[in-house]
Regions:
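Bacterial Sec-dependent N-terminal signal peptides
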Residues: 6-34, 159
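Short, solvent-exposed loop/linker segments at the N-terminal edge
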Residues: 37-54
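Short, solvent-exposed loop/turn segments enriched in Ser/Thr/Gly
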Residues: 50-58, 117, 128-134
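Short flexible loop/turn segments that cap and initiate beta-strands
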Residues: 54-55, 61-106
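Surface-exposed loop/turn motifs at beta-strand-loop junctions within extracellular Ig-like
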Residues: 64, 127, 138-142
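Extracellular/luminal low-complexity segments enriched in Ser/Thr/Pro
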Residues: 99, 106-129
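Short, exposed coil/turn segments at beta-strand boundaries within extracellular/luminal domains
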Residues: 141-149
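C-terminal edge beta-strand
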Residues: 149-156
């Protein structure tokens, strides 16, 4: 009887170990430290920290089920879908290709690698009131489709008054 039980247990794959490849789809999330920024009528520079109130950090993450997606280069694509006049995107990663003479370059879209399923980038308010919609996507290789999510960042909404209207 124990031989039959052992054979049945072996046949069904019992005994633990890896669950193997799962068929779970990718999910993506995008959040910002602040979704409302003041108008930058003084044209203050972009930066990270409390000394830079016109800049917010955005965090993009993707999971396959409950686990982070695999790492790699050029995994996330993030774009200013609309509202570019309210502010551009920045890497602020210190890489030479993302700055000119030590000054960070502004972008309408960024491409990011994945480390532990996520990465971060930045949005910097301009002197134009409005809402910027930022969309990020990741390719789900199992489903062979793009998975995306968006977030809105309001510039100039904190006071209710626009400092500059065109």
């Amino acid at each position: 009887m124990s031989a039959v039980f052992a054979a049945a247990l072996t046949a069904c794959g019992g005994g633990g170990g890896s669950p193997g490849d799962t068929s779970e789809s990718y999910t993506i999330s995008l959040r910002a430290e602040r979704t409302s920024l003041p108008l930058n009528v003084g044209h203050y520079p972009v930066g990270i920290g409390v000394e830079y109130p016109y800049t917010t950090t955005l965090y993009v993450n993707a999971k396959k089920g409950s686990a982070p997606i695999p790492g790699g280069e050029d995994i996330f694509a993030c774009n200013t879908e609309y509202g570019l006049s309210s502010g551009p995107l920045y890497y602020l990663d210190g890489k030479d290709e993302h700055q000119k003479e030590g000054v960070p370059l502004a972008y309408r879209s960024v491409t990011l690698g994945s480390n532990s399923g996520g990465n971060s980038f930045h949005f910097h308010a301009s002197d134009q009131a409005g809402t910027a919609k930022i969309t990020c996507s990741v390719h789900d290789p199992r489903a062979n489709r793009q998975v995306s999510t968006s977030i809105n960042i309001t510039v100039g909404g904190a006071t209710g008054m626009a400092g500059s209207i065109k």
